[in-house]
């Protein structure tokens, strides 16, 4: 019995040692992407005043008064499954399309967004939003994280801040 428990423990440790960075999958071999396999792809979108990240895609949001751009960064195999669109409420929605074979979507999946300061950020279903270089909004800033979605930003300034977190969603920030 001790041998069986020992073998099970060794197997579990060996399996866990395959773990890469949090943005990459476990032992993904040919289906995942390492940073050198990333294929950047520019996306043209309409005007938006909010960002929503869903379905295990990370959004890196860079506030910029000068430029608006959206770029997907993922392996060539994953690119067709990443959805970036502006909905009827003028929200940039970033997520995943459901593939027939879920192993096709393993690996690094990031969307880099440069846009004017946005007043509403929402992360859900393991989608994460990372705000770089601070966020300065003249009016109200709404942050909503749920279903394991996370929002991380530093150096926040706004008139009113409304932050909601539930279902394992996290919101973190400094200098609010």
Regions found by a protein language model. Name each.
Residues 1-4:
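Positively charged n-region of N-terminal signal peptides that target proteins for export
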Residues 7-15:
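Bacterial N-terminal signal peptides
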Residues 9, 62, 154:
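Active-site-proximal flexible loops/turns
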């Amino acid at each position: 019995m001790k041998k069986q428990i020992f073998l099970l423990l060794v197997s579990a440790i060996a399996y866990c040692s395959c773990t890469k960075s949090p943005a990459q999958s476990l032992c993904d071999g040919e289906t995942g992407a390492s940073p050198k396999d990333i294929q950047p792809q520019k996306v043209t979108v309409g005007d938006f005043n909010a960002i929503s990240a869903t379905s295990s895609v990370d959004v890196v949001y860079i506030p910029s008064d000068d430029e608006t751009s959206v770029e997907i960064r993922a392996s060539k195999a994953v690119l067709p499954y990443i959805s970036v669109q502006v909905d009827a409420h003028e929200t940039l929605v970033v997520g995943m399309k459901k593939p027939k074979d879920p192993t096709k979507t393993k690996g690094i999946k990031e969307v880099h967004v440069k846009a004017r300061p946005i007043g509403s950020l929402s992360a859900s279903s393991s989608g994460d939003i990372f705000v770089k270089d601070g966020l300065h909004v003249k009016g109200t800033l709404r942050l909503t994280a749920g279903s394991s979605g996370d929002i991380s930003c530093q150096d926040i300034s706004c008139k009113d801040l409304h932050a909601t977190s539930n279902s394992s969603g996290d919101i973190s920030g400094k200098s609010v």
